[in-house]
Amino acid sequence: MKLHEYQAKMLFAQYGIPIPKGLVCTTPNEAKESIAVIGYGPWIVKCQVHAGGRGKSGGVRIVRSKEEIQEFAKQWFGKHLITEQTNHIGQPVSKILVEAAIDIAQELYLGCLVDRSNQCIKFIASIQGGIDIENIAKEKPHLLHQIILDPLIGPQLYQSRDLAFKIGLSSKKQINQFNKIFMGLATLFLEKDLVMAEINPLVITRLGDLICLDGKLHVDSNALFRQPELCKMLDPSQEDKCETYAKQHNLNYIALNGNIGCLVNGAGLAMSTIDMVKFYGGEPANFLDVGGRVTQEKVTKAFQIILSDKKVKVILVNIFGGIVCCDVIAKGIINARLESGINIPVIVRLEGNNAKQGIQHLVNSILNIRIATNLTTAAKQAVALVEGKQCLF
């Protein structure tokens, strides 16, 4: 789960990480009057969306008057901000953060993430930060310095000092400030079950102080049950509507960019199905795991979600019935087909618990449903149908 910048900064403040004075606003008039609380300008106004690259798309601006703040707010409230990290629709803007502008001497970078490849928590710091950090990582990897954080013993001051020296901090004042920021960010990361925390840029002001100008936090969605306060920070407007709808019905759905819809039981089998589709030259439209305790109604909901993606040309159903009853799945497929009225090809592979009964239900339905005897055949058929080829298998 992603958090907005203003939410991240609220948490930063709770953990002793310095941030600029600011106010989050929900109306143009509120934005205009925010400077009475913030103080003298100039100010920075920022659209709050779950995407990077806001500055390059006009979603971040420096302003010097009430009127400019109000103009910016009127321009963006109720609109969609499109950046290099969003789709062509963009993300809706319903909040704007107004902050005191900071006189910057240097931009640094500090981040923490779960490194799944190496099965560890990794801190990364760089002497160069800002909007081009991705390019720096690609073109100047020697500027990125890393340490491993052990969750069992927590962050250590010697690790903080090591990073501070590597990114060029030398004065006692700055090293002490960096230590406080490092320890605060690491503690926040561990206590709030984060998978990514980023301060970019972490700036040195003209007065030599360190302050966090922008921040990103991603929470482990699997740990939200023990983070009730973070659950309240979810902004559904920033989420994929299909994914939100799926969560409400206890379905694990992730939208992809292809045109072959997939309905599978079990995350491992779902990933194998996606791999098989890709292997034979197709592009999956989604990951969808209906789980073990699936009902006829749940299958119908799953079909509705898949069909809401207008790119989908074929639906591939791959069910291995253990706990799941294949005849229940079959009845759900038939109901979904009749309710939707959409006549795109559906390929079904059923194995296991009540598979014969399920297949018989599908055959008797006289609908445009093809039966596959194995996953290889099912994937080949799906790809062939998308490409407009005749299925010979």
UniProtKB/Swiss-Prot annotation:
Q: Name one Pfam family in it.
A: Ligase_CoA
Q: What pathway does the annotation place this protein in?
A: Carbohydrate metabolism; tricarboxylic acid cycle; succinate from succinyl-CoA (ligase route): step 1/1
What does the UniProt keyword field contain?
ATP-binding, Ligase, Magnesium, Metal-binding, Nucleotide-binding, Tricarboxylic acid cycle
**In the UniProt record, does the keyword Ion transport occur?**
no
An individual GO BP term: tricarboxylic acid cycle
Q: Where does ATP bind?
A: K46, G53, R54, G55, E99, I102, E107
Q: Which residues form the signal peptide?
A: none
What is this enzyme's EC?
6.2.1.5
**Annotated binding of substrate, by residue:** N265, G322, I323, V324
Q: Per UniProt, where does Mg(2+) bind?
A: N200, D214
| Cofactor(s) needed | Mg(2+)
Q: How is the cofactor bound?
A: Binds 1 Mg(2+) ion per subunit.
Instruction: Describe the location of the ATP-grasp domain by residue ranges.
Output: 9-245
The kind of enzyme this is, by top-level EC class, is: ligase
Q: Name one GO molecular function term.
A: succinate-CoA ligase (GDP-forming) activity
The protein's superkingdom reads Bacteria
What cellular component GO annotations does this protein have? cytosol; succinate-CoA ligase complex
Q: Which reaction does it catalyse?
A: succinate + ATP + CoA = succinyl-CoA + ADP + phosphate; GTP + succinate + CoA = succinyl-CoA + GDP + phosphate
Function recorded in the entry: Succinyl-CoA synthetase functions in the citric acid cycle (TCA), coupling the hydrolysis of succinyl-CoA to the synthesis of either ATP or GTP and thus represents the only step of substrate-level phosphorylation in the TCA. The beta subunit provides nucleotide specificity of the enzyme and binds the substrate succinate, while the binding sites for coenzyme A and phosphate are found in the alpha subunit.
Which family is annotated?
A: Belongs to the succinate/malate CoA ligase beta subunit family.
Q: Which PANTHER family match?
A: SUCCINATE--COA LIGASE [GDP-FORMING] SUBUNIT BETA, MITOCHONDRIAL (PTHR11815:SF10), SUCCINYL-COA SYNTHETASE BETA CHAIN (PTHR11815)
Subunit composition? Heterotetramer of two alpha and two beta subunits.
What name goes with this protein? Succinate--CoA ligase [ADP-forming] subunit beta
Source organism per entry reads: Baumannia cicadellinicola subsp. Homalodisca coagulata
Taxonomic lineage from the root: Bacteria, Pseudomonadati, Pseudomonadota, Gammaproteobacteria, Candidatus Palibaumannia
